[in-house]
Amino acid sequence: MFLRIRFALIIAICALLTACGGADRVGQANLVGQVNLAAAAPSVTTYYAASRLLEQASMGPSPSSVAQVRKYGIEAWIDAQQKLPPSVITTPANLLEFDDQNDRVLADLSWNTYRFNLQNIFLASEDQLRVRTSWVLSNFLVISTSKVKSYGGAEYMNLLQSNAFGNYSDLLKAISINPSMGTYLDNNQNNKWNLNENYGRELMQLFSVGLVQLNMDGSIKRDANGKALETYTQSDVIESTKALTGWNIATPNCGSTIKNCLNWANYGKPMVANEGAHNTDGKKLLGKTIPAGQTAVKDLESLIEILVTHPNTGPFVALRLIQGLTTSDPSPAYITRVATVFQNTKGDLKAVVKAVLMDSEARAGDVPGKSPAGFGRIKEPHLINTSLLRAMECPKAGTLTNTFNAWTQDPLNAKTVFNFYPPNHRAPSSKLLAPEQQMLTSEEFNMRLGRVSGAFWDPQARGLIEAGCNLDALSAAASASESEILNLISQRFFRGAMPAVTGQALLQSVNVNNNPLVKAGQMIDMALITPAFGVSK
């Protein structure tokens, strides 16, 4: 049954995101123009437009956030969001004290504390645009808590939050000497006598210049025979690695009360340079030279400067930010405009994120039916879950809101450095880029069904109470009439524009039951697997 549902949804998604374009950059026809900010934005922010923006720029619309966007307008809301201080996980000391894997009770306490605090940021933080940006960054600047544990995950999320609207050079420098990344990709204690190329390679391949040379529109440069031109060589990997040698996690000083002191105590601090282990030879990579005799800090700065100013990095980062915020298969013109902002501002992420969101292609769909052909993205499982909970006004982490054990995407815990899905994955039998589609499995659909109605079956509503959910409007609508509950579900989950056929499907999904909240929950369960909810278009 679930395989049939999955297949039907994929077909529907492909129909919603109709693609066209060439083999190298799939999307719409190349458009001519420079940065084009919100030329198509309506003068008054409608409910539909506000909800749509929040699907792109937050962890999901909530009634209060929709009202806020409508009050300030889209651009003013973005500007205000970018001025807010970062929300961070404020309990790393507890995580450190609890994270002793030899003690199962303390280990479980550590993981639960970490996950609840992380989920609180996703659900309830005021700086939702920053949080969404950090989420996107975490999906290509990858670590995994399976290796760095809960304390490392908390500190890495804090790092992303603190740098999400800063300069990309500063972000890469901070990541390069972050203990979580140093542990995950083996640059901690990397020395000139025994080079480990892991981080030096991934810093280029996944974090900056990529494997193949790109034009500004994201298309691949090719030689006369049509072969893709490689960005770097094995020699470049070695030279990059030499520039990164000599960094160690600082020696901890946390007293005798913390059992895992030696492993985790300084994960919240940058690694420190051991100049004796640093390679001071001159380095040549990507056509540039790093002078001999420099310190580990200076070599790192020189390396990052080479990578961030490389002509590939603008379109490389632009594509990943666009894919994570607005559309999986952006047009060449859209990529060009955002990449141009990246290059002109030398990697100012605040300006780049705003350019992604305010581009005319991103905002055209604020008028229903006006999205460019092929525009949109499939919501990944974690975003579906946070969108559900924010729509239901559930602001706190708890049994109900803890997605990590129940659903198929554990934030900051991808199985490999290549993330949960590759950015170049294409929908079946289509040229359409659809990375998140790879996570649409029968298991994932199965986990959506019954989640909300199951919570309402509990007569004590323990999960709902623990999560602080505000169910007043839902309860009133469910008790009033079918039309009232359909209208509320349309507002909360479909931007106020639920298709009529979807409404009929929701009504038909309800089992005979006298509890109006259970009925509402069954309808929401079904809403979660509809293409109209699962695709942000």
Short names for language-model regions:
Residues 1-9:
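Bacterial N-terminal signal peptides that target proteins for export
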Residues 28-52:
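Post-signal peptide N-terminal segment of mature Sec-exported envelope proteins
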Residues 55, 61-163, 261-262:
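N-terminal accessory alpha/beta regions
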Residues 70, 82, 97-100, 111-118, ...:
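Active-site substrate-binding loop specific to GH73 endo-beta-N-acetylglucosaminidase modules
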